[in-house]
């Protein structure tokens, strides 16, 4: 469906678009094209004003029940009015008088084509739309947006590129076309903070209708923004909640969905047209309950995120619109062109609000000499922070590959620099309290982080990024450090330049960058299980196909050996984490054990009942040899003796030397096997 967004329906960015109420005199002076724009108001008016409304007679005048109180009456017959009273907004007949809006209410019936609407209908739609506050103009003030979505406070002023009239038109045309949309834009143009808000607005106005050419029944469904991490769900939902003029979730168009969500973050009065911020796993449980699907951080290739893309593509007729948002298409453009049916590609040009300077610090050691390379890197980092120092009261972020490196680099820097040092990553509790210290300190703060800070938390006073250019890529029973991709570099660099000018200092040669195929270093059971649930054909229906298909087929055989029905698997997928696929054998044994095992997966609390149950699975590991690492840590070189990766080598750390065998409880807990 080719449909352009008329100017009067732009979302108010409170910069050059404001909420506005049009007068009948203004309508009289408009061109026919401008007048026809009001025909589209019939869709939001039917949904939000006329739904369950009826005709009443109020002081002798026929009106809609949403205009005035009165006794329900039979509607009058309507021909051409003999007189128009613009001041009273009424059509006058010889036998009766009817309000502009009531006239339109009676004329806008199912199957009526909107290009047939005459001036009389359009004037009534203008009045109904004014009451809903759905119109906008280039003149106005922020306070005019109060109440547009039931908000008590005005919308935020947003000068970002994604809310310009040009971008709004382009995004609307793609949304209403029902084609899959791939949206890119530089960090700082407002992809995640503004585009979901814009799609919420379009959904509020026009969502649920099969066409905008004529009046039909509608099926209202919310928008969902699917994200890879809980931290992102909380961050972005709070940002959009505030920018729409709300201070509380209840009654707002914003809802959150993630596992073990606290009571205070549940919207008890959600809107049918609203937007749900959800983790990928919970998005999959009710994927077809949503009209518009937005998948963010596509470049990360989160496993469940990639599965959602595959499922949505397979069942695209069950979703009205799908948006894939990513910082860059460097790694995925060609695959998306082939994989998605007739995709639309939108790029929002623009950059961060403030300039970012780049500084390259050369490491003279070759990365193949890993230990020497890292020691040189740490020396270079100290020099760089001394030369390129954040101002007092500001902060810098050091990006390293792993949690262990966070502690290693913090210890090294603390001995050599007089600044406040902090660590932030996904396993750190009470990040907000750390940020309070960062924001309140008059000193320079240096935050050492994993790739977690690429997107999960916005640091408002950061002015400098120190990027080591590496990431730890987990693999079954291990993992390795790799150099980052261009998209990861763009994300890290974009952490500055939002509030003040920034500096991006990088310590790696750009030639080292490469795309990361995460699927080649993942457990593949989720691909098998969700393929069964959603009737995907493997491997061709997968967004990213593993290089080694033998592992995919071995995983399928292993899952089949559990002798668990597809129906039971689907229930397990919807209710439990199953961080180890073998836990499924325990979840089906009894509700009491399932509850305790679920609690262990969520909180880490290991009861004796759960431990004994997991030990019964005999997840055996053979210890080949060991070596002393430091005071209370020994590195054990082992071989996996169970599952798809039987025979795979693994490295396990333990507080004392072991020989023989150990049993795996989780990816971090191991129990020595008693040799007696």
UniProtKB/Swiss-Prot annotation:
Residue ranges constituting the Helicase C-terminal domain according to the UniProt record: 366-542
Entry EC no(s): 3.6.4.13
GO molecular function, one term: ATP hydrolysis activity
EC class (word): hydrolase
Chemical reaction(s) catalysed: ATP + H2O = ADP + phosphate + H(+)
Protein keywords: ATP-binding, Early protein, Helicase, Hydrolase, Late protein, Nucleotide-binding, Transcription, Virion
Keyword Ribonucleoprotein annotated: no
Gene3D superfamilies for this protein: P-loop containing nucleotide triphosphate hydrolases (3.40.50.300)
PROSITE patterns: DEAH_ATP_HELICASE, HELICASE_ATP_BIND_1, HELICASE_CTER
Amino-acid positions noted as binding ATP in the UniProt annotation, renumbered to this chain: 185-192
UniProt motif DEXH box: location: 296-299
Induction trigger: Expressed both early and late in the viral replicative cycle.
Chief location of this protein within or outside the cell: virion
GO cellular-component term (any): virion component
Subcellular location: Virion
One Pfam family, short name: NPH-II
Positions of the Helicase ATP-binding domain: 172-347
Role: NTP-dependent helicase that catalyzes unidirectional unwinding of 3'tailed duplex RNAs and plays an important role during transcription of early mRNAs, presumably by preventing R-loop formation behind the elongating RNA polymerase. Might also play a role in the export of newly synthesized mRNA chains out of the core into the cytoplasm. Required for replication and propagation of viral particles.
Family to which this protein belongs: Belongs to the DEAD box helicase family. DEAH subfamily.
PANTHER family (alphabetical): ATP-DEPENDENT RNA HELICASE, ATP-DEPENDENT RNA HELICASE DHX37-RELATED
Assembly and binders: Monomer.
Name of the featured protein: RNA helicase NPH-II
Protein species of origin: Variola virus
């Amino acid at each position: 469906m080719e449909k352009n967004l008329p100017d009067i329906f732009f979302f108010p960015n409170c910069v050059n678009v404001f909420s506005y109420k049009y007068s009948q005199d203004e309508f009289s002076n408009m061109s026919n094209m401008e007048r026809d724009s009001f025909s589209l108001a019939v869709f939001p008016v039917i949904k939000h004003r006329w739904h369950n409304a009826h005709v009443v007679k109020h002081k002798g005048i026929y009106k809609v029940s949403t205009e005035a109180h009165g006794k329900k009456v039979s509607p009058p017959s309507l021909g051409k009015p003999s007189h128009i009273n613009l001041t009273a907004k009424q059509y006058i007949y010889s036998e009766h008088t009817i309000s502009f809006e009531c006239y339109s209410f009676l004329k806008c019936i199912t199957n009526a084509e909107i290009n047939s609407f005459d001036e009389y209908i359009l004037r009534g739609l203008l009045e109904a739309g004014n009451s809903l506050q759905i119109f906008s103009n280039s003149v106005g003030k922020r306070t005019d947006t109060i109440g547009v979505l039931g908000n008590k406070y005005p919308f935020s002023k947003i000068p970002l590129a994604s809310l310009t009239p040009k971008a709004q038109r382009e995004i609307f045309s793609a949304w209403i076309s029902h084609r899959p949309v791939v949206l890119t834009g530089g960090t700082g143009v407002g992809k995640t903070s503004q585009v979901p808000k814009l799609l919420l607005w379009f959904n509020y106005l026009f969502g649920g209708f099969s066409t905008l050419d004529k009046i039909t029944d509608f099926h209202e469904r919310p928008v969902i923004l699917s994200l890879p991490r809980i931290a992102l769900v909380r961050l972005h939902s709070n940002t959009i909640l505030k920018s729409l003029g709300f201070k509380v979730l209840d009654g707002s168009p914003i809802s959150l969905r993630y596992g073990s969500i606290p009571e205070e973050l549940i919207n008890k009065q959600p809107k049918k047209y609203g937007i749900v911020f959800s983790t990928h796993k919970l998005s999959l449980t009710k994927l077809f309950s949503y009209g518009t699907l937005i998948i963010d951080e596509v470049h990360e290739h989160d496993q469940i995120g990639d599965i959602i893309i595959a499922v949505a593509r397979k069942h695209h007729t069950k979703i009205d619109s799908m948006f894939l948002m990513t910082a860059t298409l460097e790694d995925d453009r060609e695959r998306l062109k082939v994989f998605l049916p007739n995709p639309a590609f939108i790029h929002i040009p623009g950059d961060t609000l403030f300039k970012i300077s780049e500084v390259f610090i050369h490491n003279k050691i070759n990365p193949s000499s890993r230990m020497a390379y890292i020691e040189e890197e740490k020396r270079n980092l100290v020099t760089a922070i001394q030369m390129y120092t954040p101002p007092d009261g500001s902060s810098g972020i050091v990006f390293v590959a792993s949690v262990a490196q966070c502690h290693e680099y913090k210890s090294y820097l603390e001995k050599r620099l007089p600044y406040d040092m902090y660590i932030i990553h996904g396993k750190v509790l009470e990040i907000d309290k750390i940020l309070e210290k960062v924001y309140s300190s008059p000193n320079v703060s240096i935050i050492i982080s994993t790739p977690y800070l690429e997107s999960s938390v916005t640091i408002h006073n950061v002015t400098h990024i120190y990027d080591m250019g590496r990431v730890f890529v987990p693999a079954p029973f291990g993992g390795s450090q790799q150099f980052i991709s261009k998209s990861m570099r763009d994300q890290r660099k974009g952490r500055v330049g939002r509030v003040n000018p920034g500096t991006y200092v990088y310590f790696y040669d750009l030639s080292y960058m490469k795309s990361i195929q995460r699927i080649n270093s993942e457990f593949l059971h989720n691909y098998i299980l969700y393929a069964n649930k959603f009737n995907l054909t493997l491997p061709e229906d997968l967004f990213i196909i593993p290089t080694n298909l033998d592992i995919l087929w071995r995983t399928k055989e292993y899952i089949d050996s559990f002798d668990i029905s597809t129906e039971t698997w689907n229930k397990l997928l919807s209710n439990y984490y199953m961080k180890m696929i073998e836990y499924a054998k325990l979840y089906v044994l009894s509700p009491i054990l399932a509850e305790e095992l679920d609690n262990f997966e969520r909180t880490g609390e290991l009861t004796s009942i759960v431990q004994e149950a997991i030990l019964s699975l005999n997840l055996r590991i053979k210890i080949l040899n060991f070596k002393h690492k430091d005071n209370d840590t020994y590195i054990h070189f082992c071989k996996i003796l169970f599952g798809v990766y039987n025979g795979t080598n693994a490295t396990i750390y333990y507080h004392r030397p072991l020989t023989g065998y150990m049993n795996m409880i989780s990816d971090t807990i191991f129990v020595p096997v008693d040799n007696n």
